[in-house]
């Protein structure tokens, strides 16, 4: 049975515990499809106060995470999870996308090291396999990014989602990476806004064509950078501008 094993190394364990215990991730752990451990980096610090940060050499604002506690936490995690990839959450990292999330899910073992303060001592990089970012912005720490990695990867593990087709139909899924089509549920009319007729028709072929058209339109309008990378057949180029009566 495939499953995802993760160990999150953090200075603030409670920030991660709540999220991992709820909703799909909580159920995945109960089902044995996700094994999530949270390690307090301070457990690997020395001294009475277990200090994990210090002033940067060369001067400058803020504090830098010391190498000893984090590297020792990584080494201990590697011993628990042989073969795991060590991933440091960092604005300098590769952008997390669906393809990378799938690689993480398929690999099955991750050690996620969360940065804090002004950054991490560069010597820690000798113990890291890769750095990952969730966008071109700066957060207070790497915990939110680590949780994004776990969430994105775990939902791709077979059995985690109730309907296996859910992951395949979502935005960025599949080789094309299109955005998802719009979703509707009851009631059929809300404040004068009606659900598209085609979704109520029961005609599965028309529904699939409508969903395909709307995914193409959404990607073209909202993420032209993605749209220009997709090689579309002539049928899709015709479909994207087709009216509902042409579906």
Curated annotation (Swiss-Prot):
Leading EC class: transferase
Enzyme Commission code: 2.1.1.228
Annotated residues for binding of S-adenosyl-L-methionine: 115, 134-139
Disulfide bond entries: none
KW tRNA processing (keyword) present: yes
Catalytic activity: guanosine(37) in tRNA + S-adenosyl-L-methionine = N(1)-methylguanosine(37) in tRNA + S-adenosyl-L-homocysteine + H(+)
A GO biological-process term: tRNA N1-guanine methylation
This protein's GO CC annotations: cytosol
An example molecular function term from Gene Ontology annotations: tRNA (guanine(37)-N1)-methyltransferase activity
KW Membrane (keyword) present: no
Chief site of localization: cytoplasm
Sorted UniProt keywords: Cytoplasm, Methyltransferase, S-adenosyl-L-methionine, Transferase, tRNA processing
Subcellular location: Cytoplasm
InterPro entries: Alpha/beta_knot_MTases, tRNA_m1G_MeTrfase_C_sf, tRNA_m1G_MeTrfase_TrmD, tRNA_m1G_MTases_N, tRNA_MeTrfase_TRMD/TRM10
Job description of the protein: Specifically methylates guanosine-37 in various tRNAs.
Subunit organization: Homodimer.
Protein name as catalogued: tRNA (guanine-N(1)-)-methyltransferase
Gene name tied to this protein: trmD
């Amino acid at each position: 049975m495939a499953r995802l094993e993760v160990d999150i190394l953090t200075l603030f364990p409670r920030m991660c515990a709540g999220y991992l215990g709820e909703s799909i991730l909580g159920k995945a752990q109960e089902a044995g499809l996700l094994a999530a451990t949270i390690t307090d980096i301070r457990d690997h610090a020395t001294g009475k106060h277990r200090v994990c940060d210090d002033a940067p050499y060369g001067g400058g604002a803020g504090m830098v995470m010391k190498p000893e506690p984090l590297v020792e936490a990584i080494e201990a995690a590697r011993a628990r999870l042989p073969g795991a990839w060590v991933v440091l959450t960092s604005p300098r990292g590769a952008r997390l996308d669906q393809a990378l999330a799938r690689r993480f899910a398929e690999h099955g073992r991750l050690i996620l090291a969360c940065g804090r303060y002004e950054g991490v001592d560069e010597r820690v990089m000798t113990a890291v396999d890769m750095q990952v970012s969730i966008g071109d912005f700066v957060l207070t720490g790497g915990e939110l990014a680590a949780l994004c990695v776990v969430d994105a990867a775990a939902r791709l593990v077979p059995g985690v989602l109730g309907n296996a087709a859910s992951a395949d139909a979502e935005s960025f899924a599949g080789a094309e990476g299109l955005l998802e089509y719009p979703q509707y549920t009851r009631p059929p009319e809300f404040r004068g806004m009606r659900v598209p007729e085609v979704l109520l028709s029961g005609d599965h072929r028309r529904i699939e064509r409508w969903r395909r058209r709307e995914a193409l339109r959404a990607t073209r309008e909202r993420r032209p950078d993605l749209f220009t990378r997709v090689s579309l057949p002539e049928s899709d180029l015709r479909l994207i501008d087709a009216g509902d009566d042409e579906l």
